[in-house]
Amino acid sequence: MMDTAPLRDAYRALLNAAATVAESGDTSPAPPAGEWNADQILAHVALVNAATITAVSSAATGATTTYDNRTAQDTWTLGRVIALSGGNAGLRDRIRLQADALCALGGPMLSETELDTLVPALLLSNGKVLVDQPVPLRDLITGLAEVELPGHTQQLLALLPEDRGTRATT
């Protein structure tokens, strides 16, 4: 059985960062050039979560699956997910529920054999191919906990005004 505590911790950190940014008083923190705003980051995470839930569910049924994160980087799709979720608070709720689902599905539900299922994967970041080969399902799940979610947590925190820490302590 896979230990999903690191995944749950990564989601908790991401959601705490998202709440901090939302509560910062800046209703739309400006991202650095070429980066996403907070809602776009959260929509991307929600889409990645949905793709991961699909892969996990497919493995549990014995169905063939693939994992492709290109849709999670499409600007139109991000905007649609933001609108359908009802904005920032809705995105955070969606991610929280997806986190609960992934931690339940990826932990006690899957056997070691299912976690070792090879999933053809295409993972891009900033237009560059990171992975284009089959990977074990467990690596998709641990990749969320170890790379994807912490990276987006930092991306969210980078949206905070630089004097935020100063104001919070004075």
Language-model regions, residue ranges each:
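A hydrophobic membrane-anchoring alpha-helix module
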Residues: 140-166
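Alpha-helical scaffold segments that form or flank carboxylate-/histidine-based iron centers
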Residues: 1-9, 26-48, 78-94, 121-148
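Structural signal for well-ordered, non-membrane alpha-helices
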Residues: 12-22, 49-57, 96-110, 149, ...
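Serine/threonine-rich low-complexity intrinsically disordered regions
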Residues: 3-6, 26, 66-71, 77, ...
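Short, helix-capping/interhelical loops that line the mouth of catalytic, cofactor-
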Residues: 1-5, 51-101, 163-170
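Helix-loop segments that flank and shape redox-cofactor active sites
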Residues: 13-38, 58, 62-67, 108-133
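Residue-identity detector for glutamine
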Residues: 40, 73, 98, 133, ...
